[in-house]
């Protein structure tokens, strides 16, 4: 299946208008327990695009259901599960889903682009973590030094 029909990761950053998402929600709710896979997928896609974390989480849950129950939709689900987890900050999960897609489609440009975004975020957060740990260590060293000097003066 060609990879050019998947959107680029940056497209997921622009949420649907509330009225557009409501159309998808209404259709999903209207179909109830007999909801079709396409309706569920469309609603999950709209939720993933949201800028509201609870909606993104629900979108990931719906996509997980589709991935588990409908093998013919797994390819699309892999990409959107990677995208949804990326937006939620679940970078290990995002990478896992994205890498699975890349195993089958190494030339998939959208998935390659998403891999770069995931790697950049992981690197930035890693650097932030190192900076925080370094700052805490420095502060502890300064406090320890001050206490040591204070104890030395009392002797």
Curated annotation (Swiss-Prot):
Signal peptide: none annotated. Residues 149-155 are mitochondrial intermembrane. The chain crosses the membrane at residues 128-148. It is a single-pass membrane protein. It is found in: Mitochondrion outer membrane. GO terms for cellular component: mitochondrial outer membrane; peroxisomal membrane. The keyword Transcription does not apply. CDD domains: Fis1. Residues 1-127 are cytoplasmic. It comes from the Eukaryota. TPR repeats lie at residues 75-108. Disulfide bonds: none annotated. Pfam families: Fis1_TPR_C, Fis1_TPR_N. One of its GO terms (biological process) is autophagy of mitochondrion. Its main location: mitochondrion. Keywords: Membrane, Mitochondrion, Mitochondrion outer membrane, Repeat, TPR repeat, Transmembrane, Transmembrane helix. Has a role in mitochondrial fission. Has a role in outer membrane fission but not matrix separation. Belongs to the FIS1 family. The C-terminus is required for mitochondrial localization, while the N-terminus is necessary for mitochondrial fission. This is Mitochondrial fission 1 protein. It comes from Tuber borchii. The lineage of its organism: Eukaryota, Fungi, Dikarya, Ascomycota, Pezizomycotina.
């Amino acid at each position: 299946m060609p990879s050019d029909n998947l959107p680029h990761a940056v497209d997921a950053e622009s949420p649907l208008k509330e009225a557009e998402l409501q159309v998808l929600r209404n259709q999903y709710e209207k179909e109830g327990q007999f909801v079709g896979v396409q309706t569920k997928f469309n609603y999950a896609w709209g939720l993933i695009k949201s800028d509201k974390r609870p909606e993104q989480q629900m979108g990931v849950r719906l996509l997980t259901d589709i991935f588990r129950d409908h093998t013919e939709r797994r390819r699309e689900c892999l990409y959107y599960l990677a995208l949804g987890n990326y937006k939620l900050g679940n970078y290990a999960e995002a990478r896992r889903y994205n890498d699975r897609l890349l195993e089958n489609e190494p030339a998939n440009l959208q998935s390659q682009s998403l891999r770069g975004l995931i790697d950049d975020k992981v690197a930035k957060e890693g650097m932030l973590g190192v900076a925080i740990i370094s700052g805490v260590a420095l502060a502890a060293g300064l406090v320890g030094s001050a206490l040591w000097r204070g104890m030395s003066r009392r002797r």
